[in-house]
């Protein structure tokens, strides 16, 4: 079998790729692996899910796997991914399990594991779990009987604990702010409106009626058209959109203009520096963040550290360097002082808190970043490595970088999952960016044509 765990856990088509049998096997392997690491007590697991219909099926399989291996389970029901991480820490659990495919379409689902404290599961533990599943050794372990079988407890007030935690982190009350929140018919449907109201905001919730089938369906952080319209119609100061598991946050201004993760990071970085909480005056972002963010942060005296694409790499850099803020252009924002993973509702609260504290509209705050025009071309290739590394391609990239200088940049990277090479160019004008990107893309096509 191929690699089971990707950068965001196990993902696949529910009941096709990600079957109940696989969910059970992963859960059994996780429970046994943790028990072997610490035999002083039976493992304790927190299990949550988003609103996908398949979540109920997978939850049953995972809970059965955990308890059959002797682990006790706290079942928290439908909650955001960061809430499951938070409750894993609160319960002093050995592992957290979130059943979600985040922003993916409804037919997909996933299994994301958290370690004690709600942190990312260490790679070595993940590899042991994967090896056990792949070798099919999960059926060979001795099964506990009698009192050794794990028990299940349903936590009914987990959402309340989480909301109180979030609201307690906010520097300024949100009284007087009217916000439209798009809950993506997902895990934020109850929690996000509750948190924003508890903090003082007037809330209009849309796409907050999940039925198991409508999660991320033309709504949420990847589809903001309805949010833009609702903000204008309701005369709100801003709109906030989350994805299916509420680990992302993007916003729109009172006029309906989108504010992406780069701009949100810049707003929060300036607020935190002003409060003296931006460690080393440093922000962590990925290489996909717009050059406009780097230019803005340099102008403001804030250092920008770049990582590979993926919020896991942002998290790793934040923890390794003891930094206080990082994220992605897509809206994954991480504030380690308050959360162990990207938290969309937390981000929304702090974004509105900055508006309340300064009295400035979102559009004015977001203007600190002037994104450069960006062109992205996905080039189909026969071989991703050849397409990205051929001498003629590298020469064209070098020529482009010399032309653009400090006024633009080129990012060339093979896709991790598809036979594509992604060519991204930022420049002073869209015309220049497109011309440069097309030149490079043509060299990529020539170097590795599709057979």
UniProtKB/Swiss-Prot annotation:
GO molecular function: magnesium ion binding; phosphoglucosamine mutase activity; phosphomannomutase activity
Annotated Mg(2+) binding sites: 102, 243, 245, 247
Keyword check for NAD: no
A Pfam family of this chain: PGM_PMM_IV
InterPro entries, per the entry: A-D-PHexomutase_a/b/a-I, A-D-PHexomutase_a/b/a-I/II/III, A-D-PHexomutase_a/b/a-II, A-D-PHexomutase_a/b/a-III, A-D-PHexomutase_C, A-D-PHexomutase_C_sf, A-D-PHexomutase_CS, Alpha-D-phosphohexomutase_SF
Cofactor field: Mg(2+)
A GO term from the CC aspect: cytosol
Keywords: Isomerase, Magnesium, Metal-binding, Phosphoprotein
List of residues that carry Phosphoserine: 102
Alphabetical GO biological process terms: carbohydrate metabolic process; peptidoglycan biosynthetic process; UDP-N-acetylglucosamine biosynthetic process
Keyword Magnesium annotated: yes
E.C. number(s) listed in UniProt: 5.4.2.10
Active site per UniProt: 102
Catalytically driven reaction(s): alpha-D-glucosamine 1-phosphate = D-glucosamine 6-phosphate
Cofactor binding notes: Binds 1 Mg(2+) ion per subunit.
PTM text: Activated by phosphorylation.
Function text: Catalyzes the conversion of glucosamine-6-phosphate to glucosamine-1-phosphate.
Protein family per UniProt: Belongs to the phosphohexose mutase family.
HAMAP family: GlmM_B
Protein name: Phosphoglucosamine mutase
Species assigned in the record: Salinispora tropica (strain ATCC BAA-916 / DSM 44818 / JCM 13857 / NBRC 105044 / CNB-440)
């Amino acid at each position: 079998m191929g690699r089971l765990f990707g950068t965001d856990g196990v993902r696949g088509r529910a009941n096709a790729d990600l079957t109940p049998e696989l969910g059970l096997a992963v859960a059994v392997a996780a429970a046994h692996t943790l028990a072997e690491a610490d035999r002083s007590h039976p493992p304790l697991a927190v299990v949550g899910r988003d609103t996908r219909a398949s979540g109920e099926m997978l939850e049953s399989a995972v809970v059965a796997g955990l308890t059959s291996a002797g682990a006790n389970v706290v079942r928290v029901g439908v909650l955001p991914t960061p809430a499951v991480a938070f409750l894993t820490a609160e319960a002093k659990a050995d592992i957290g399990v979130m059943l979600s495919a985040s922003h993916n379409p409804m037919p997909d689902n996933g299994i994301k594991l958290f370690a004690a404290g709600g942190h990312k599961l260490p790679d070595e533990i993940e590899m042991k779990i994967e090896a056990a599943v792949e070798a099919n050794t999960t059926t060979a372990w001795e099964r506990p009987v009698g009192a050794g079988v794990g028990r299940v407890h349903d936590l009914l007030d987990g959402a309340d604990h989480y909301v109180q935690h979030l609201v307690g982190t906010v520097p300024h009350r949100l009284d007087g702010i009217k916000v439209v929140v798009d809950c993506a018919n997902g895990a934020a449907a109850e929690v996000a409106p509750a948190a924003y109201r508890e903090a003082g905001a007037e809330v209009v919730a849309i796409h907050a009626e999940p039925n198991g089938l409508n999660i991320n369906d033309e709504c949420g952080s990847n589809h903001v058209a309805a949010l833009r319209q609702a903000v204008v119609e309701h005369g709100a100061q801003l709109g906030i959109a989350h994805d299916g598991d509420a680990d992302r946050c993007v916003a729109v201004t009172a006029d309906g203009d989108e504010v992406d993760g780069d701009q949100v990071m810049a707003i929060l970085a300036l607020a935190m520096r002003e409060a003296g909480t931006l460690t080393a005056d440093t922000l962590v972002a990925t290489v996909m963040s717009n050059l406009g963010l780097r230019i803005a942060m340099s102008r403001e005296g804030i250092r920008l550290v770049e990582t590979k694409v993926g919020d896991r790499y942002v998290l790793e850099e934040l923890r390794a360097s003891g930094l206080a803020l990082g994220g992605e252009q897509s809206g994954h924002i991480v504030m380690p002082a308050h959360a162990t993973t990207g938290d969309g509702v937390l981000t929304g609260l702090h974004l509105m808190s900055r508006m309340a504290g300064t009295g400035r509209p979102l559009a004015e705050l977001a203007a600190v970043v002037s994104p450069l025009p960006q062109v992205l071309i996905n080039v189909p290739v026969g071989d991703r490595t050849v397409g990205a590394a051929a001498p003629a391609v590298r020469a064209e990239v070098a020529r482009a970088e010399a032309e653009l200088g400090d006024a633009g940049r080129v990012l060339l990277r093979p896709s991790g999952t598809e036979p594509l090479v992604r060519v991204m160019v930022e420049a002073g004008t869209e015309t220049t960016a497109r011309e440069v990107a097309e030149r490079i893309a043509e060299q990529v096509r020539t170097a590795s044509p599709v057979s």
